[in-house]
């Protein structure tokens, strides 16, 4: 799944709007499984995972096996892929670092040969590339890392008329925009930058309180939280009272006394 680029919008999950569809689906699943619960509780499916991951995924695999068709295969593939994605976080950070370093290496050059790009990457002693493998980052490893962003080498022509395997800076624009801090040369000419927009916290945006993971979430939204549409109104406060009249909270405000000329 690619990261959202500036200017792209993704429809948010709305608990109040989407909950009824999920509730209806849950009821249908419960009715379908209810008659088979004794058999399902005794099931011991073949798991592609081990330890805690297997414990987490086993109920879903059991339901998939019960459904039949291609669901057993799809469920097991999803379990393996999602576990691999979680374990790939560190590798993902490495790929992002590669994008940043490639941007530095390109500068304003429209093309770079693979040899020159590798020379610049491996010449940075503070980067991980000189020690990436036994001899540092090579062409095959560079190609594999960049393929995750749909960036591939090709025969490129240089200003002096020569040709060699290399990369075009324009092919990095999309990945730089999605995964790296914004910079002027991250965008093709004529494409303006998209200003970032602050977003409200999920609880404020959806009009819901955050769930503590223990208590049952309240189905009713908190009226004091903003629902993301109407302008929030200022909380009501008791008005100030004049001197000599009853104050707030049932407390009388003592009348003022004139101390001038007192004996």
Curated annotation (Swiss-Prot):
Region listing for Disordered, in residue ranges: 183-263
Keyword Metal-binding belongs to the record: no
General function of this protein: Probably does not play a direct role in plasmid integration or excision.
A family per Pfam: DUF3631
Ranges of Polar residues composition bias in the record: 230-239, 253-263
Species this chain originates from: Saccharopolyspora erythraea (Streptomyces erythraeus)
Keywords: Plasmid
Protein known as: Uncharacterized 28.9 kDa protein in xis 5'region
Miscellaneous information on this protein: The given protein N-terminal is putative, as other possibilities exist in ORF1.
Alphabetical list of InterPro entries matching this protein: DUF3631
TM segment ranges: none
Highest taxon of the lineage: Bacteria
């Amino acid at each position: 799944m690619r990261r959202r680029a500036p200017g792209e919008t993704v429809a948010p999950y709305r608990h109040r709007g989407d909950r009824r569809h999920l509730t209806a689906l849950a009821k249908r699943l419960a009715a379908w499984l209810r008659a088979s619960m004794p058999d399902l509780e005794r099931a011991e499916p073949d798991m592609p995972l081990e330890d805690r991951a297997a414990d987490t995924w086993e109920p879903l695999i059991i339901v998939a096996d019960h459904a039949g068709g291609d669901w057993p295969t799809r469920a097991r593939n999803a379990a393996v892929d999602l576990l691999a994605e979680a374990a790939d976080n560190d590798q993902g950070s490495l790929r992002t670092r590669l994008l940043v370093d490639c941007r530095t290496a390109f500068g304003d050059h429209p093309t770079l040969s693979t040899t020159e790009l590798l020379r610049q990457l491996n010449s940075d002693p503070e980067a991980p590339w000189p020690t990436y493998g036994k001899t540092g980052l090579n062409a095959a490893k560079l190609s594999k890392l960049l393929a995750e962003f749909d960036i591939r080498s090709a025969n490129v022509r240089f200003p002096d008329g020569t040709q060699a395997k290399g990369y075009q800076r324009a092919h990095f624009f999309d990945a730089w925009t999605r995964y790296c801090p914004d910079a002027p040369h991250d965008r093709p000419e004529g494409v303006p930058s998209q200003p970032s927009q602050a977003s409200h916290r999920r609880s404020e945006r959806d009009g819901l309180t955050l769930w503590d993971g223990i208590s049952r979430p309240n189905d009713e939204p908190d009226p004091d939280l903003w629902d993301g549409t109407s302008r929030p109104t200022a909380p009501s406060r008791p008005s100030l009272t004049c001197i000599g009249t009853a104050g707030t909270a049932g407390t009388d405000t003592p009348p003022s006394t004139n101390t001038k000329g007192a004996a």
